[in-house]
């Protein structure tokens, strides 16, 4: 079972994503802030799904950059999906090293399919 860390400061969103991904066979650690995400991250983490906007002026890009710079326990090439309701964030997320950008709202099955595709390649 792939290990996924989902980060969104909206508790309802993070719980919904956790439920949907677990139904599709993923092991999910649901986090509402960067500190929790860092605590759940380890070398067995296969992917991250991170909301762009997080609480306290934090951004999903902060976690993405930390992963890519080797500042977390995850491997530097761990798959990272950034999501946002603002399409203008896509280029910045991809330039920072995100594997994919998901524009919210997206169909419930799209995330699972994308994760399966990223993890199989």
Name each model feature, range by range.
Residues 8-9, 51, 85:
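Acidic di-acidic motifs
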Residues 11-29:
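Two-component/phosphorelay signaling modules centered on CheY-like receiver
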Residues 29-47, 55:
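Acidic, metal-coordinating helix/loop segments flanking the phosphotransfer/catalytic sites
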Residues 46, 72-79:
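His-Asp phosphorelay/catalytic-motif detector in bacterial-type signaling
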Residues 50-67:
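Conserved phosphotransfer microenvironments
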Residues 81-83:
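Hydrophobic/aromatic residues positioned on beta-strands within the core alpha/beta folds
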Residues 85-102:
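Alpha4 helix (beta4-alpha4-beta5 surface) of REC/receiver domains from two-component response regulators
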Residues 106-115:
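C-terminal output helix
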């Amino acid at each position: 079972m792939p290990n996924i860390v989902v980060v969104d400061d909206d508790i309802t969103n993070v719980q919904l994503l956790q439920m949907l991904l677990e139904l599709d066979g993923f092991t999910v650690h649901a986090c509402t802030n960067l500190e929790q995400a860092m605590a759940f991250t380890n070398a067995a983490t296969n992917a991250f799904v991170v909301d762009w906007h997080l609480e306290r002026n934090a951004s999903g890009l902060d976690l993405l950059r930390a992963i890519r710079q080797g500042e977390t326990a995850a491997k530097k090439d761990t798959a990272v999906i950034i999501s946002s309701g603002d399409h203008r964030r896509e280029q910045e997320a991809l330039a920072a090293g995100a594997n994919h950008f998901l524009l919210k709202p997206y169909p419930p099955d799209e995330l699972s399919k994308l994760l399966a595709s990223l993890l199989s390649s």
